């Protein structure tokens, strides 16, 4: 049941996870809101449509599916690099977020006068170990992470909402760039997360053993869905949560709220590591992929 809603959890979590780093200094700029809405229509919506369509067409995960589709279309092998790039980008995003979580947790502990007697890089490495272990649970940590993040934000709301003065300002290139960046963040920056989520649903539906029955079952599974029926709810959820995330981007959280928020972030980021591990497992096997993902992310976390 949880697998079926993985894409919706991701649609809700990505804005909450990443918008705080991309939000404008003043979220009251009406022109920025309009630019972001245009970017959501022109960038986010087509990307989600494309990922769902590719999931239907390939009936496989992004890395294996892209290799399959390029062979069938006799396309340039360079397109096969998309799957590898998606796995790499997921690891990089996870490492950056875990590094940010380490800083946030340390700041909250300082406010609580409970600073651990360990170096900051050791704390980041410890959080990395916890996150990679959580990644073994697959989709299960997503609702837990969402719940913790929401509770943390609600504790911030009890201290008062940030004051926002809405005004129309001049449109400039940096606003366009920020609006497009937020739209890309909403869809995971092209990591193929929605493609992967739809593939999980398809694999869950397919339960037959022999090849012929399996193929027919997959065809039936694909025919049960329509692209718009899946894409529009995901896109609307991205839009609604994105608005909330932008409005709350300037809000300060109390120490306990910060701890809950960042612990929830670790649960969410574990899914990114799970995703990258599953992609690499297509080529190297699960154990080697898990170790490679852990080592790569750990190096990035400590380096940052």
State the predicted function of each range.
Residues 5-8, 36-41, 73, 77-94, ...:
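Hydrophobic alpha-helical transmembrane segments of multi-pass small-molecule transporters/permeases
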